[in-house]
Amino acid sequence: MAIERTFSILKPDATERNITGAINALIEKAGLRIVAQKRIRMTRDQAETFYAVHKERPFFGELVDFMISGPVVVQVLEGEGAIAKYRDVMGATDPSKAADGTIRKLHAKSIGENSVHGSDAAETAKIEIAQFFSGNEIVG
């Protein structure tokens, strides 16, 4: 399996509860390396651009408001099959349906406040990474 990079966000519900270290430990335990990481406060424009794919969905406004409600941690993760591996580590969007031991089963508050985001495909990962990181910020 090829070494890949994927994009991750530790959302405001995670930073608010000071559980970013616990989430990072689960990421690293899964064999993924954190090759870039920074704590930011997303602007409304950043959140709307990032979640533009959901613009016509009824939850779009609430999602954007949530993502700008507090600091987030944006990350680039690297490892073999990183995209699929991180999606497995995150667990199902609905924490009640997430597998035991996953980030969302352990830490998510609800479907909306589900602690983490991860890219769903290689092309998406490239786009998402470029929205928040320049090349010299990614140190593998």
From Swiss-Prot:
The protein's Enzyme Commission number: 2.7.4.6
Keywords noted in UniProt: ATP-binding, Cytoplasm, Kinase, Magnesium, Metal-binding, Nucleotide metabolism, Nucleotide-binding, Phosphoprotein, Transferase
GO molecular function: ATP binding; metal ion binding; nucleoside diphosphate kinase activity
Matching InterPro entries: NDK-like_dom, NDK-like_dom_sf, Nucleoside_diP_kinase
Subcellular localization, as worded in the UniProt entry: Cytoplasm
Complex formation: Homotetramer.
The protein's role, per its UniProt record: Major role in the synthesis of nucleoside triphosphates other than ATP. The ATP gamma phosphate is transferred to the NDP beta phosphate via a ping-pong mechanism, using a phosphorylated active-site intermediate.
Similarity comment: Belongs to the NDK family.
Identification of the protein by name: Nucleoside diphosphate kinase
Organism encoding this protein: Rhodopseudomonas palustris (strain TIE-1)
